[in-house]
């Protein structure tokens, strides 16, 4: 399985399917590619904020692929693209993979309109991975750790709108994955963080932290 971090909370995960999560490229000051450079089979949106959903419609229209998101967000998008709605606790079978929606503690709007609950996603592909979305740590992570057991987790570390490094360490202590990948940091000054701090402290928990460069391909 290949993982590419496009910056911020945007990832391409290429396994049995090519999954694109939270596309934010055109407005991302750190982005190294354009939305038209992206390929995918499906887009997952954790919530509707511009820095997570900004390029979803353009990419979905060009590739003629569906966007999976919370019900209220899909209601706002379905006039423009094919959508798949979901909510917390729900699982969608998309060809050879399973996509489960779980809780995230944040907010969600799209172009100023209410967009439902924010989500995290647990995807069962060649390996199981958990993209936490924008969130703080929360008690449901204990259930995710016990029953879902994701091997790979992507967690925000930038603070201000989400967890910071110290809170992400608490989340990792709960989740106990094999591998963690930090996200949602250094895109803007208000979310400045050093992922090396996470790597150093997580090693004491026996968790490997991989810090990819933007557009670096990681085989896991």
UniProtKB/Swiss-Prot annotation:
Pfam families: Lactamase_B_3 (PF13483). Keywords: Hydrolase. The keyword Hydrolase applies. SMART domains: Lactamase_B. GO terms for molecular function: hydrolase activity. InterPro entries: EF_Hand_1_Ca_BS, Metallo-B-lactamas, RibonucZ/Hydroxyglut_hydro, UPF0173, UPF0173_UPF0282_UlaG_hydrolase. The keyword Hydrolase applies. Belongs to the UPF0173 family. This is UPF0173 metal-dependent hydrolase PTO1118. The lineage of its organism: Archaea, Methanobacteriati, Thermoplasmatota, Thermoplasmata, Thermoplasmatales.
């Amino acid at each position: 399985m290949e993982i590419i971090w496009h910056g911020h909370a945007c990832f391409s995960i290429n396994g049995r399917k090519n999954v694109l999560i939270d596309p934010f490229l055109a407005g991302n000051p750190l982005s190294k590619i354009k939305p038209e450079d992206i390929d995918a089979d499906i887009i997952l949106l954790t919530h509707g904020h511009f820095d997570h959903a900004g390029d979803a419609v353009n990419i979905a229209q060009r590739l003629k692929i569906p966007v999976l998101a919370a019900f209220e967000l899909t209601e706002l998008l379905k006039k423009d693209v094919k959508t798949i709605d979901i909510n917390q606790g729900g699982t969608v079978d998309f060809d050879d993979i399973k996509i489960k929606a779980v809780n995230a503690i944040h907010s969600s709007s799209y172009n100023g309109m209410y967009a439902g609950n924010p989500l995290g996603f647990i995807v069962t592909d060649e390996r199981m991975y958990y993209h936490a979305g924008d969130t703080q740590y929360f008690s449901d992570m204990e259930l995710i750790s016990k029953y879902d057991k994701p091997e790979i987790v992507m967690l925000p570390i930038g603070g201000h709108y989400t967890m910071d490094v110290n809170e992400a360490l608490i989340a990792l202590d709960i989740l106990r994955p094999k591998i963690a990948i930090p996200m949602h940091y250094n895109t803007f000054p208000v979310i400045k963080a050093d992922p090396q701090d996470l790597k150093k402290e997580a090693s004491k928990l026996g968790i490997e932290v991989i810090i990819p460069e933007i557009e670096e391909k990681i085989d896991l």
